[in-house]
From Swiss-Prot:
Annotated keywords: 2Fe-2S, 4Fe-4S, Cytoplasm, Iron, Iron-sulfur, Metal-binding, Mitochondrion
Protein name: Anamorsin homolog
Region (Linker): 161-188
Any one GO molecular-function label of the UniProt entry: metal ion binding
Keyword Chloroplast recorded: no
Annotated region described as Fe-S binding site B, given as residue ranges: 238-252
InterPro entries xref list: Anamorsin, Anamorsin_N_metazoan, CIAPIN1, SAM-dependent_MTases_sf
Similarity-based family: Belongs to the anamorsin family.
Length: 277
């Protein structure tokens, strides 16, 4: 809504006196804007100090202009009513039509500002004294304030600032290196298992009939028992082989043979080397 239309349709003037001129109201309204003041058709309520409730709908006017003589006007109840009828963002202009001593004026202005702030208004500020009305009545002081641009009970979401987590500088591991970088290509190659022999695998491994891995030759070398050369020319590294089994070690090739003299040929029966089974 523009200022001209606002001044024409939604101005309310209050006074504790029995009479007030329209010129007084229009001159006071010039504090808000000059455009459209001459076409202003305000609503005027006299002897407003006796009212406990204003006969207006809530949020129905844009400007409220109380002009008073008594230092006690407007009361707290009337301030509450003026706040109710003002639209969000509306303006209130309070004028005194009596001259006062400078010290009393400052005290009255401070009291009015405090009363308006407690009543819910914002930006309460003192106005410079100037003539008000057709009779050039001097306005000893005045106070201007605004109603908040939001309605009572309205709510809106607040944008919460997102705090990023604090980054901790940790240099304890700055000297460490990646272990994987120490590996070469040879280290990464999969090891090749040795080829499996053609002999059977089990808890008791032995050479097969057609052994080609050399196991048969190894088994022949470790077979216990005297060879033909040992029987023809018996020798002993320990010197006890010819004394009998009581003096022979566990791996003695002559174990099981009767006592003999070293260097003499040992005679065995024909079935000595034949297996019992």
């Amino acid at each position: 809504m523009d200022t001209k239309r606002m001044l024409q349709n939604s101005v309310l003037a209050l006074t504790d006196d029995t009479l007030i001129s329209i010129g007084t109201v229009t001159n006071a309204a010039r504090e808000v804007a000059n455009d459209g003041v001459d076409q202003c058709d305000p609503q005027i309520i006299t002897q407003a100090s006796s009212l406990s409730k204003l006969p207006l709908e809530p949020s129905s006017v844009d400007i409220v202009i109380p002009i008073f003589r008594s230092i006690e006007f407007p009361g707290d109840l009337l301030v509450k009513e003026m706040f109710r009828v003002l639209k969000p963002g509306g303006t209130i202009l309070i004028y005194s039509s009596q001259q006062s001593v400078i010290g009393e004026t400052d005290k009255a202005i401070s009291g009015l500002q405090r009363k308006l702030l407690l009543g819910g208004f914002l930006e309460a500020e003192a106005l410079q004294p100037k003539p008000v009305g057709l009779s050039n009545v001097v306005c000893s002081f005045g106070v201007k304030a605004k109603k908040p641009s939001w309605n009572i009970g309205s709510s809106f979401a607040l944008k919460k600032s997102i705090k990023s987590p604090v980054k901790v500088q940790n240099d304890d591991y700055s000297d460490l290196i990646d272990e994987d970088s120490l590996l070469t290509e040879e280290d990464l190659k999969k090891p090749q298992l040795p080829p499996v022999g053609d002999c059977e695998v089990g808890s008791t491994r032995k050479a097969c009939k057609n052994c080609t891995c050399g196991r048969a030759e190894e088994e022949e070398k470790v077979k216990l028992g005297p060879t033909m050369d040992q029987l023809s020319n018996p020798q002993s590294a320990c010197g006890s082989c010819g004394l009998g089994d009581a003096f022979r070690c566990g791996t003695c090739p002559y174990k099981g043979l009767p006592p003999f003299k070293l260097g003499e040929k040992v005679s065995l029966s024909e079935n000595f080397l034949v297996a019992d089974i």
